[in-house]
Amino acid sequence: WQNRRFFWNAKTKRPWVVLKWAESRDGYMDGRPLQERQPGAGGFPITAETARPLTHTWRALEQGIVVGANTALVDTPELNVRSIEAPSPRIVLLDPDGLINMEHALIQRNDNLIYVVGPTKGSVTKHSCQWEVKEGLDALLERLYAEFNLSSLLVEGGATVLNDFLKQDAWNEIKCWRSPAATGGGLPAPTIPDHSLPLPHGLASSGQLGVDAWTNRLHSRHASD
């Protein structure tokens, strides 16, 4: 189990993919209506501050952290490790439709950011990766592994990106926070698939930190790991 990333890399030539999100008690990732989720609006906290150290520990475990263009525009996230002493993973920004301006803070502040763009944009940053949505996520994962040697990824959003990974079955592990508070509406969170399993070898698959609960699930393809 401890070497799961290495064995998966050797077998598939793709990174180990961990999907991560936080949801309210009634199943929303963001409690704001669509008209309020506009570029520059900022993030919408779901969990309490007490959840942050574990979230940053999860980030530090992986080599890359994936975010979609819409989330980058609306939330303007930092996507680094701040609450613990550990290196931050490389940011992988998915923007195949060219929505992001080169002056965006994520690009300006992260010299080693991997910018995933459509083939018509060419190499727009020092670390560009060309990819089209129609190629599928497996093609992107193979490219990120071959070109940037990323052995593992933490996919943090947004909802569209997370659901794409789920629909294409391009994931290995899920880590989900659940808040005791309800938002009463907003942006629906993804649904953990029925074919997910508890972690093996008696490892904790759920827990509580402060008021928030967390769940860690494994894809059923790893049932014998």
Regions inferred by a protein language model and the residue ranges of each:
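A gly/proline- and charged-residue-enriched helix-loop-helix capping module
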Residues: 2-3
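Enzymes that bind and transform nitrogen-containing heteroaromatic metabolites
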Residues: 7-225
